[in-house]
Amino acid sequence: MIQFDYMILGILFALIAGYCRALFECIILFDSLYEKHGYSEWWSYSRFTQNKIGYWENTFPNDGGHRIKIVEFIFDALACVCLSYSYDEILHSFMATMMSVMITYFFIKSFGFEQTFKELR
């Protein structure tokens, strides 16, 4: 029997994990742009945190995004537990990881960062 409350909770945790992953990728992107092109008002880390995620600057300082990565893993684990408990099958827990990857790709694609990632590689 499917328990929809745990399934919805698992999907919510996967969405939060995907958002944390997108923040991590943005921090890596801005650090890489700074190393390659130097300081610019368009891609500085301080401008990014001031305009987009001011709360995160106080909670997660510029440490390369490692603390955001830890938060992402916590929400991925919660999503896996909720999704596996919702249907009593361990295979459904992989949905959380796949959804996290898809949501990350959506955020990166919607912000138009994929071309910049190709240039940095």
PLM segments and residue spans:
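Catalytic phosphate/metal-binding cores of nucleic-acid and nucleotide-processing enzymes, i.e., regions
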Residues: I2-R121
